[in-house]
Amino acid sequence: MKVKICGITDMETAKRACEYGADALGFVFAESKRKITPGLAKEIIQELPANVLKIGVFVNESVEMIQKIADECGLTHVQLHGDEDNYQIRRLNIPSIKSLGVTSESDMKNAQEYETDYILFDSPKEKFHGGNGKTFSWELLAHMPKELREKTILAGGLNALNIEEAIRTVRPYMVDVSSGVETEGKKDVEKIKQFIIKTKECSK
């Protein structure tokens, strides 16, 4: 099971997450309490192992700006959390991830219409797109087609206490955590370590 730690804002957390076995790190360029500047993201990314995915998170940003930041920072993927459509997705010259809020089983059908490399299933959107720390009913995704499951990233309120049930129910390709590895709004490296250990253990 692959693990993505999202909302990275400092070098130390990024390096420790990689040491503990994170497969991907997320950098938020949209409005969020975890927003990072392209300059700082570039500094961090330059120090990371080549095999770790570096994913930029955007919300309704222009294709030109997404591409500019991706090239400048050395991103490997971009994650689209807004109302982006296939026309915009096709214009991107970088692998992409489309985020969808889950409210019913029909969201699986909607997801298959997007021409992206991965689909990230998250809790329904609130003030900020993602990172709200709230779960949704994983049972809604329990019967997805194999071809969709193989490109599914599961997010939304995950933590070390509920990750086993989430993985058992959805069986995604990757899990994505942000607020579930924080203490008082800041990334907690011990929680990151425990989340990664638990995820890898229960997906063997």
UniProtKB/Swiss-Prot annotation:
Catalytic activity as recorded in UniProt: N-(5-phospho-beta-D-ribosyl)anthranilate = 1-(2-carboxyphenylamino)-1-deoxy-D-ribulose 5-phosphate
One Pfam family recorded for the sequence: PRAI
Keyword terms of this UniProt record: Amino-acid biosynthesis, Aromatic amino acid biosynthesis, Isomerase, Tryptophan biosynthesis
GO biological process: L-tryptophan biosynthetic process
Enzyme Commission (EC) number: 5.3.1.24
Pathway listed: Amino-acid biosynthesis; L-tryptophan biosynthesis; L-tryptophan from chorismate: step 3/5
InterPro entries according to UniProt: Aldolase_TIM, PRAI_dom, RibuloseP-bd_barrel, TrpF_fam
Top-level taxon of origin: Bacteria
Keyword Isomerase: yes
GO molecular function: phosphoribosylanthranilate isomerase activity
HAMAP family, per the entry: PRAI
Family, similarity comment: Belongs to the TrpF family.
PANTHER family: N-(5'-PHOSPHORIBOSYL)ANTHRANILATE ISOMERASE
NCBIfam families found in the cross-reference section: PRK01222.1-3
Protein name in the entry: N-(5'-phosphoribosyl)anthranilate isomerase
Gene name of the encoded protein: trpF
